[in-house]
């Protein structure tokens, strides 16, 4: 469970860096207008929503561990590239980041529920609460770093957060308990 919590930390700190400061990064780096930056933020957040939606069927098809591993580690090349791209590349890259990194949330919840059968509600509450809490702490911390350095520096250091996804290799292969299996099994038609 501790490994999953580290993965949640890396994922939500990175997501909050984009959702909270992406517009400032675009304005500062590319000198776009506030309105243009907000449209680009909308495009990123739409990709996050789509990735979250797609994560469920991917988890059903390939398994939670594979989706967690693929999502958090798979986003690393995109996050490492982001601070070094031009405007068009940044927009395209942010769409890829949103789609890939957000696809793991449902997989993480399902995986944690498989690790702790009988605590399905507690696990879901822990993960939702923790993700929002870490996001709030991340926004404040990254804002303080940006104030002391620059918004570009924040994106350079945040680019490495998904590397924490290497811990995914240490995730055990859980056996679904009857509670999780009953939830995960589609109803007969």
Model-found features: residue ranges?
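Extracytoplasmic gate region of multi-pass secondary transporters
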Residues: 1-52
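Helix-to-loop junctions at the C-terminal end of transmembrane segments
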Residues: 51-63, 146-147
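Structural signature of the two symmetry-related core transmembrane helices
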Residues: 66-81, 156-159
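Paired small-residue
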Residues: 88-97
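Intracellular juxtamembrane helix-capping segments at the cytosolic ends
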Residues: 103-116
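A late C-terminal transmembrane helix in Major Facilitator Superfamily
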Residues: 113-151
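Symmetry-related core transmembrane helices of the 12-TM Major Facilitator Superfamily/SLC fold
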Residues: 155-171
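Intrinsic disorder in cytosolic terminal tails and internal cytosolic loops
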Residues: 171-189
């Amino acid at each position: 469970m501790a490994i999953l919590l580290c993965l949640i930390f890396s994922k939500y700190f990175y997501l909050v860096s984009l959702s909270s400061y992406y517009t400032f990064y675009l304005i500062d780096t590319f000198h776009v207008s506030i309105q243009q930056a907000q449209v680009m933020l909308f495009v990123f957040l739409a990709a996050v929503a789509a990735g979250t939606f797609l994560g469920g069927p991917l988890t059903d098809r390939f398994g939670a561990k594979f989706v967690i591993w693929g999502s958090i580690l798979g986003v690393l090349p995109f996050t490492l590239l982001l601070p070094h791209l031009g405007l068009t590349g940044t927009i395209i890259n942010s769409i890829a980041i949103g789609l890939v990194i957000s696809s793991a949330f449902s997989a993480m919840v399902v995986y944690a529920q498989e690790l702790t059968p009988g605590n399905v509600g507690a696990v879901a509450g822990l993960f939702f609460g923790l993700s929002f809490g870490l996001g709030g702490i991340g926004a404040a911390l990254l804002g303080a770093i940006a104030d002391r350095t620059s918004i570009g520096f924040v994106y350079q250091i945040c680019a490495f957060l998904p590397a924490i996804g290497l811990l995914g290799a240490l995730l055990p292969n859980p056996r679904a308990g009857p509670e999780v299996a009953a939830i995960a099994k589609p109803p007969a038609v």
